[in-house]
Amino acid sequence: MFYKIAQSIMFQMDPERAHNLAIGSLKRTANTPMTAFYAQCIAPKPVTCMGIIFPNPVGLAAGLDKDGEAIDAFHAMGFGHVEVGTVTPRPQPGNDLPRLFRLKPAKGIINRMGFNNKGVDNLVANLKAKKTDILVGVNIGKNKDTPVEEGKNDYLICMDKVYPHAAYIAVNISSPNTPGLRTLQYGDLLDDLLSSLKAKQTELAEQHGKYVPIALKIAPDLTDEEIASIATSLIKNQFDAAIATNTTLSRDGVSGLANANETGGLSGKPLTELSTKVIKKLAAELKGEIPIIGVGGINSSQDALAKFDAGATLVQIYSGFIYQGPKLIKDIVASYSAK
């Protein structure tokens, strides 16, 4: 009830202003009696993925809390994990405004944010400051002004800094809003990046005395051959998980709607079937050797179950969470527990 009232107010506002207001409010109310407005008790349904025991299979996808400012508030809502980021070595403003658009009739969102964030050092400070024990994955990327061929160094810098504080690390090479980034998903560039990250993980595990898994986040706009090639590279380089998928450049199902022609990645309900299809294909290629975290267009518990059936071990929500509120977490966990 409270969420529906808050949503009706937020949906009258500019999307990015509403987003910033929401994160600010959650940051201020976390670990105070005010959490009563959004906290909920969810019966545990533990799931093991990447060698980690998650309290339930529903996580918050990267992009909502880029700088890790409201982690404890999302814990109160019952998320099994939170993925913060995408974070880059240096702070950057992202793309010009406006850059976030609602497609309300389709329950979709288009964004061209461009990895706006306050930098990895700021994120690390926020990770150190969190008061709950929620599992936090950190999604890392490259700065816009770093040439693609030197992008690997940005990932290694971020990995080095977040490693002691992360439950797992997600490598984002699939955002459509950083020029050239998606080229890292192919061929020798991908193999070189993954092998370098794996070597860095081995070095950091020894240095810190703990193993932090690494996952690769991929795009939905891939051919079957490209998915097969990525799967081969993930297995070869002994990655710990794949996250499928990021936003799509496709506009299937939204043509003619207001904002549909805006540049950027489309998320939400229009992405549901495409991301599930990619998960199914990826699962067939990985053959159970590497787990998949399913994300993209989960707007109901049925959508989440379809992701699990396609081969996902965990799921994450973002756009569906904006449209449905915290109740979606509870619904998915209940349906998962009953299956």
UniProtKB/Swiss-Prot annotation:
Q: How does it assemble?
A: Monomer.
Q: Which GO terms describe its cellular component?
A: cytoplasm; plasma membrane
Recorded E.C. number(s)? 1.3.5.2
Function noted in UniProt: Catalyzes the conversion of dihydroorotate to orotate with quinone as electron acceptor.
Catalysed reaction equations from the record = (S)-dihydroorotate + a quinone = orotate + a quinol
Q: Which InterPro entries match?
A: Aldolase_TIM, DHO_dehydrogenase, Dihydroorotate_DH_1_2, Dihydroorotate_DH_2, Dihydroorotate_DH_cat, Dihydroorotate_DH_CS
What domain of life does the native source organism fall in?
Bacteria
Assigned keywords, A-Z: Cell membrane, Flavoprotein, FMN, Membrane, Oxidoreductase, Pyrimidine biosynthesis
> What residues sit in the active site?
175 (nucleophile)
Please report which protein family the annotation says this sequence is part of.
Answer: Belongs to the dihydroorotate dehydrogenase family. Type 2 subfamily.
Cofactor mode of binding and number, as noted: Binds 1 FMN per subunit.
The topology of this chain with respect to the membrane is: Peripheral membrane protein
Q: What is its main location?
A: membrane
Protein localization: Cell membrane
Cofactor requirement: FMN
User: What pathway, per the record?
Assistant: Pyrimidine metabolism; UMP biosynthesis via de novo pathway; orotate from (S)-dihydroorotate (quinone route): step 1/1
The residues that the entry says bind FMN are: 62-66, 86, 139, 172, 217, 245, 268, 297, 318-319
Instruction: Using the record for this protein, list the coiled-coil segments as residue ranges, or answer none.
Output: none
The protein's name: Dihydroorotate dehydrogenase (quinone)
**Alphabetized Pfam families for the sequence:** DHO_dh
> What are the GO MF terms of this UniProt record?
dihydroorotate dehydrogenase (quinone) activity
Q: Which GO terms describe its biological process?
A: 'de novo' pyrimidine nucleobase biosynthetic process; 'de novo' UMP biosynthetic process
Residues binding substrate are 66, 111-115, 172, 177, 246-247
